[in-house]
């Protein structure tokens, strides 16, 4: 069972709502609102990464690639408002396990 989820999301309200929902289900959630913070959090203890695509200091594609190039095998799920097929395919090709569009 997953226990530690890293949420990389720069929309404060969405991050807080997602964090609350996950914590109420018993998950430990660590949040980052940019890639610099996410890089500082990422380690083997993270069981799942929920990753926004558009962030203030880069994009989720590059971080997903960094995760995979670094040998990390935890699932990565894009959680983003960008829903066109080309972006979904690109995310999956870079190693994401799933791609969920947010409202």
Predicted segments with their positions:
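N-terminal/domain-start alpha-helical segments
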Residues: 1-103
